[in-house]
Each structure stands twice: as C-alpha cells, then as structure tokens.
C-alpha cells in the first residue's frame, strides 16, 4: 500500500535510502539518521513523504516545497522491484499534479543509477545539469595568513543576517539555477536547517568593505565531517584570491571542530573557476548528482 510516512518510520527509511544508494555505488558515503529526520520534517515548509509499504518500506519519495521559489524537489529511493518503484514514482507525481500545479520540479540521482535515470526520462523529465559532491580528507588545522588589507570575521547569522543575505544574493546572482529569496524567507530557511553550524558563518572584507561570505554546516557530523554550505565573493572583488582564503578558512574551522574531512557541492558547469579551486585545494569528487527538471 501507499501511505504517508511519519517520524516513526525514520530508521526504516534510513535503511531503505542507504540500501538504494549502496546498491548503485558501494563506495557511497552513507546517509545519517539526522538527514532522514530533516527530510521528513522539511526545511522552511513541511515535507510530504510517500512510501510504498509491502511487508516493509520498499520505496520512498520525500517531497520538499519552496513556495517563494515556486519549486518542488522530490527525492526518490527504492529497494523494491521495478514495478513497485514505478508505482510509487507515479503516485508521487500524481500528488504533485494535484497539489503543486504550476510549480517547477527539480530532482536528482546518482549518475550511476541507470534504473532511476531511465525512469526520469520515461516520465518526461529533462536533463538539467550535473553536480559534484566533493570531499577533502584529511584536513589540516591552521587558519591561513591574510594580507594586510583583508580580514575574515566570524558573523552571527541572526545579528548579521541583512549583510549575509546581501552577500549571498549578489555573489550568486549569475549562478545557474540560483533564485534569491527576500531577506525574511532567506533567514527563515537558514534557521530551519537543524544542521546549520551556528559558529560557522564568516564575512571576508577588503579594506574594511564586505566582499564575500562562507556559511558552514554540520550536515556530515555523523561521519565526522564538515560541509561548506555557501562560499561566495562579490564580482568586484574576484581575482584577489578571496575564494581560496575563505575555503581554507572553512577547512581550518572544520578541523578546529575535530572533523577529519570536509565536503561541498559544485555545479560541474560553473564557469567561475570554483571547480578548479576546489581541486587545487585537495577536494575530490565522490558522487556525480545528475539533475532533471520539468514543470507540473
């Protein structure tokens, strides 16, 4: 039967999700229970989660909604048969058709997941973009030395929310797929993230003027790893090495917390030089997430 999942299903959902991913890629970094709970609760808005239960959960679709972006993101995992997978996949999109008409849909899966990729294409979804998950391990302690005219300062997210919001929106304005939120929605979304690193927000300044930001997450804490949530530099300050300094600052911050590694996500089509920067600092791709889209 198809039913709505609850928090009571969290452990079984974790087993199903990791079973799906490890079947596709035996080297996949297993998801922690905290991530499943986050999926179930939703981010700024409540999630809707459907499962196919046939003597146990065989497939799940977590549906996240961002009304300000007019976007929904369904995440699909299955350890069932092809018929069971298709049944829940179709039920999930039927729910979207009924409840999220007019919304843009973004969904992702491992590039190695040929079965799910085929289901995406058979359902009329269009290829969008590939994204790397990259990890650096081990990581080193020690914050980088800064030029005399550059500073990197810790910033409380609430107190400095107006500035951090502006720095993110302006530095990511030209990035593919980025959709800026207004300040209040942006702050609410950040504060709703249970894995937000409340000591991991930093602002880079050049001659005292705000020039870039770094936001950190504890989303990999279960595997003793940190995560770079956002790293951006305003266009007028690019070419000064701020991105490298901020990245090294984030690495040192993660090491100070006792983490052994740090990860981040990057658009493989990013033309800003970010991918080369990450590779030069020792990050290596661990997963290629393939993105698909459609409009309901």
Predicted regions and their residues:
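Conserved donor-binding loop and adjoining core beta-sheet/short helix segment
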Residues: 7, 20-99, 106-109, 206, ...
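Conserved GNAT-fold acetyl-CoA-binding loop/helix
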Residues: 18-38, 172-189
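Acyl-donor-binding surface of acyltransferase catalytic domains
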Residues: 65, 79-150, 290-294
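Conserved acetyl-CoA-binding loop-helix of GNAT-fold acetyltransferases
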Residues: 82-96, 233, 239-252, 256, ...
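Conserved hydrophobic beta-strand within the GNAT/NAT acetyltransferase core sheet
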Residues: 105-108, 228, 262-266
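Conserved active-site alpha-helix within GNAT-family acetyltransferase domains
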Residues: 111-129, 240, 244, 269-287
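Phosphate-binding active sites in nucleotide-utilizing proteins
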Residues: 174-180, 184-188, 192-206, 210-219, ...
């Amino acid at each position: 039967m198809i039913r709505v999942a609850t928090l009571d299903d969290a452990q079984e959902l974790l087993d199903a999700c990791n079973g799906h991913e490890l079947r596709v890629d035996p080297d996949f970094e297993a998801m922690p229970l905290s991530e499943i709970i986050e999926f179930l609760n939703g981010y700024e808005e409540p999630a809707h989660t459907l499962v196919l239960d046939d003597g146990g959960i065989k497939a799940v679709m977590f549906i996240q909604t961002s009304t300000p972006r007019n976007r929904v993101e369904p995440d699909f995992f299955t350890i069932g048969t092809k018929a069971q997978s298709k049944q829940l996949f179709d039920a999930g999109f039927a729910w979207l058709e009924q409840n999220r008409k007019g919304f843009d849909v973004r969904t992702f899966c491992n590039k190695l997941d040929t079965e799910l990729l085929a289901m995406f294409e058979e359902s009329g979804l269009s290829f969008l973009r590939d994204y790397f998950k990259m990890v650096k391990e081990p990581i080193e302690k020690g914050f980088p030395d800064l030029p005399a005219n550059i500073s990197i300062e810790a910033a409380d997210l609430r107190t400095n929310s107006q500035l951090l919001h502006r720095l993110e929106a302006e530095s990511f304005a030209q990035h593919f797929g980025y959709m800026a939120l207004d300040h209040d929605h942006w702050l609410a979304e950040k504060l709703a993230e249970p894995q937000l690193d409340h000591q991991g927000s930093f602002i880079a300044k050049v001659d005292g003027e705000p020039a870039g930001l770094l936001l950190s997450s504890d989303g990999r804490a279960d595997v003793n790893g940190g995560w770079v949530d956002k790293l951006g530099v305003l266009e007028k300050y690019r070419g000064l090495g701020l991105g490298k300094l901020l990245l090294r600052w984030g690495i040192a911050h993660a090491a100070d917390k006792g983490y052994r590694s740090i990860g981040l996500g990057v658009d493989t089509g990013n033309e800003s030089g970010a991918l080369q920067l990450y590779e030069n600092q020792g990050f290596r791709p661990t997963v290629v997430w393939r993105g698909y889209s459609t409009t309901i």
